[in-house]
UniProtKB/Swiss-Prot annotation:
GO MF annotations, alphabetized: hormone activity
Gene: INS
UniProt protein name: Insulin
Organism: Hystrix cristata
Organism taxonomic ancestry: Eukaryota, Metazoa, Chordata, Craniata, Vertebrata
GO annotation (BP), single: cellular response to oxygen-containing compound
Keyword Secreted: yes
Complex formation: Heterodimer of a B chain and an A chain linked by two disulfide bonds.
Record's keyword terms, sorted: Carbohydrate metabolism, Disulfide bond, Glucose metabolism, Hormone, Secreted
Database matches in Pfam families: Insulin
Covalent S-S links between cysteines: C7-C37, C19-C50, C36-C41
């Protein structure tokens, strides 16, 4: 997994892939869009959103 820009459905698909059956949660104040869409996201950053 390479750091990359993830926006919209690509971001959701990446979260499903990383989190698996645990699912994930959305924290508006955490800025996942700023982190992953405007900037680039690492696998570690995505895992922070898993349940």
């Amino acid at each position: 997994f390479v750091n990359q820009h993830l926006c919209g459905s690509h971001l959701v698909e990446a979260l499903y892939l990383v989190c698996g059956n645990d699912g994930f949660f959305y924290r508006p104040k955490a800025g996942i869009v700023d982190q992953c869409c405007t900037g680039v996201c690492s696998l570690y950053q995505l895992q922070n959103y898993c349940n």
